[in-house]
């Protein structure tokens, strides 16, 4: 074995478009080499990108997939009737809640920032997430 891990990302436009379908795929394959890329912005379907659905959406995903996360993505989604992704900190994803859930399931890996296409957006998103991580870590500033 090469030690490689294949990451599957739940996304409304993918075949694996719900946490339930992802769980079914993981269970059917039964391989420790198949894991989840957790991107909370991707969990929202058309008509569901609204603040009132955020926590229940994240809770469901972590209940089904939390023990199988290989990588976290830091992307956001704007409140919209459709799907409108944006840089972390500019949308409705509850990042403190996301980070709490990552900690709860023992995730200690990296978070990849993406979905930032404008000048300075990555820097702004990185600063936003550093602040959320510091808050979650009792005020210590992460690297």
Question: Predicted regions: what is each one?
Answer:
Residues 75, 108-115:
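Short acidic/histidine-rich active-site segments
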Residues 21-24, 60, 97, 124-128:
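Alpha-helical elements of Rossmann-like donor-binding domains used by nucleotide-donor carbohydrate transfer enzymes
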Residues 120-139:
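C-terminal helical cap(s) of enzyme catalytic domains, especially alpha/beta-barrels
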Residues 114-115, 139-143:
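Short, flexible loop/turn segments with low-complexity composition
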Residues 91, 96-105, 109-111:
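H/E-rich (His + Asp/Glu) clusters that bind or coordinate divalent metals
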Residues 13-14, 117-120:
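Glycine-/small-residue-rich active-site loops that bind phosphorylated ligands and cofactors
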Residues 1-92:
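Acidic/histidine-rich catalytic cores of soluble enzymes
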Residues 26-29, 102, 133-137:
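Conserved hydrophobic residues forming the short capping helix/wall of the S-adenosyl-L-methionine
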